[in-house]
Amino acid sequence: MGEWFSKAGLAQFACSETQKFGHVTYFWNGNRSGKFAGETWQEVPSDVVPFEQRPWMKAAEITDAMIAALRSGQYKTLRCNFANGDMVGHTGNFRAATMSVEAVDLQLARILPVIDAVGGVALITADHGNADEMYEIDKKTGAAAQNKDGSYKAKTAHTLNPVPLILYDNVSGGRLGLRQTEKAGLSNIAATVANLLGLEKHAAWDESLLDIR
C-alpha cells in the first residue's frame, strides 16, 4: 500500500512504539527498509520492562502523535499499531491483559473525535487474536482448562478467532458501509483503503469490502 499510495502522490503518516514499529513500516512496505516518497514515520520508544508491569505500554504517546499528525492537515492517510493486546496477551496475565485493552479503548476515545473534526474515517482491525482468549480451553468439555491446583491454565499464544473490521464513519451520512462476507481477510484491506481514498486498487489486490450506498 505504501508504494501504491506514494505513486499516487499521497502523504502518509505511520506511527507505533518500538515493539510494533516494523509492522507499520518495514513489513507494511513489503519488507523494504526505506521510506517511499511522501511517508513520515514516527517511532515511540517502548518501555524496557515486562509488559504485564506496564500494560498501557505507549498507547497514549502513539495517540498524541496521531492527533498531532491529524490536526496538521499534512497527511491523506495515517496508520498506527497499538501493541497492547498482543504483547500483554502473551504474558498470560489476565488482569494486565484487561488493562491493556482498556488502555487502547481510552486512546481510541481520544483519536476518533479528532478524525471526526478533520472530516476523516477510520478502519480498525487486527491480524490475529490474543487477549480475546486468556485461558486454555479443554477440548473435551469446552470449559477453561485448569491446572492441578485448580487455577486456570493461562493461554499465551495467538488465537485463531476471526478478527473484526470496523469502519468508523461520521462524515458520509450513512453512505459508507462494509460488505458482509465470511470470506474476507487481510488481503482485502489494501483495496478497501484505496477505495476510501478514491484510488483504483492494484491489479494484484483482492477486492474492496467498501459498500457505497
What are these regions (language model features)?
Residues 1-213:
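Feature captures the catalytic ectodomains and active-site-proximal regions of enzymes
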